[in-house]
């Protein structure tokens, strides 16, 4: 192998699983290939591989809403503090938000942001759903 491919291989060894997943998705989009077919093709008779006409397109959701479902009264102060740290809301607005649940806290955010927001709010004591 050339030194350039050796360097690429060494860099690939150091990336996380999430980064590897994102890299595969970018390669698929850039070159118009499907890694799942390439992986299964090595162990399969090519005549039985699905054609493009047989595939159904399933779009992966990219934007999510984080919704506070319920806040126990004993946890209200912690949830208000967390809402304020996650948003630009003031004290009164954050208090009003948690008193009128279910309410959207974060709208049209990435899956990673939605999961992190959910984790923080659940740690504060709120019941959360992601849609």
UniProtKB/Swiss-Prot annotation:
It holds the Pfam family Ribosomal_L12. InterPro entries: Ribosomal_bL12, Ribosomal_bL12_C, Ribosomal_bL12_C/ClpS-like, Ribosomal_bL12_oligo, Ribosomal_bL12_oligo_N_sf. The keyword Transferase does not apply. GO terms for biological process: translation. Keywords: Chloroplast, Plastid, Ribonucleoprotein, Ribosomal protein. GO terms for molecular function: mRNA binding; structural constituent of ribosome. Forms part of the ribosomal stalk which helps the ribosome interact with GTP-bound translation factors. Is thus essential for accurate translation. NCBIfam families: L12. PANTHER family: 39S RIBOSOMAL PROTEIN L12 (PTHR45987), LARGE RIBOSOMAL SUBUNIT PROTEIN BL12M (PTHR45987:SF4). This is Large ribosomal subunit protein bL12c.
């Amino acid at each position: 192998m050339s030194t350039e491919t050796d360097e690429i291989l060494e860099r690939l060894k150091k990336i996380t699983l999430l980064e590897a997943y994102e890299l595969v998705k970018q390669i698929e989009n850039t070159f118009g290939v499907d890694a799942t077919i390439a992986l299964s093709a090595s162990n399969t008779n090519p005549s039985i591989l699905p054609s493009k006409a047989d595939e159904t397109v399933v779009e992966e959701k990219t934007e999510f809403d984080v919704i506070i479902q319920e806040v126990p009264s004993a946890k209200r102060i912690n949830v208000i503090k967390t809402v304020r740290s996650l948003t630009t809301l003031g004290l009164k607005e954050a208090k009003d938000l948690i008193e009128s649940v279910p309410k959207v806290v974060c709208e049209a955010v990435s899956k990673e942001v939605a999961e992190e927001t959910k984790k923080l709010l659940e740690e504060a004591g709120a019941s959360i759903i992601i849609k």
